[in-house]
Every structure is written in structure tokens, then in C-alpha cells.
Amino acid sequence: MEMASRQIVAFGGGGFSMESGNPLLDDYVLGLTRAERPRVCFLPSASGDADHDIVRFYRAFSAHRCEPSHISLFRREQGPSDLRRHLLSQDLIYVGGGSVVSLLGVWRAHGIDSILREA
């Protein structure tokens, strides 16, 4: 299968975090990966790794349609230990909404900003 080109899809609102009964936006971004079972990592950093956002993500991106994961930067005892390796292995990196100031600060502290530029 041909590898999808790298791209950024940005949207404000919608998707699993705002429209739990409407999978159209989530289906669209999954389809962009062109992978049969895309690896999808959720970064809930902007919401301070809010549990309700993580639960909604796993409900929307269930294991039967993709391989979901998330990275909690405010609770590093959870999730993958090698952030770079994990993020670079993903077909889709889904960044959740919230405070951009908080997001940028915690990303810089953990090197996520540099990893995402590389992805």
C-alpha cells in the first residue's frame, strides 16, 4: 500500500470531543491515513490530560477500527516511555483542544514540539 503524504489537518471543534454521535470528521481523518488499521495517538495536553477527553477518544477510536493510544504528559507514569519512537510510529496524531499556552509549555518541557516537527 502506498504511504500517505505528510499533512496537517487543523479544525476547531467537532469530532469526538464535541459530537459524540457524529463520526464523520473522525472517519474523514482516519481515511486520510490510507491505512487499513491506522495507529492513532491522542495528545490531550491542552486540556491538562483531562480524563473525560481521553475516554471520549477511546470510545470514538475503538480498537476494532484502529490502534488507539494516548500520551499523558501531566501523568508520565502512564503511556509509552519512548515518546519519540511512539509518535513517529503513528499514522495519525490527534491533538485535543484546550489551552494553547499550556499545550506549548508542556510540549516544550518534554520535547514533543521537536518530535512533531520531525513527524
Over which residues does each language-model region extend?
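Hydrophobic N-terminal alpha-helices or hydrophobic patches in metabolic proteins across all domains
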Residues: M1-A119
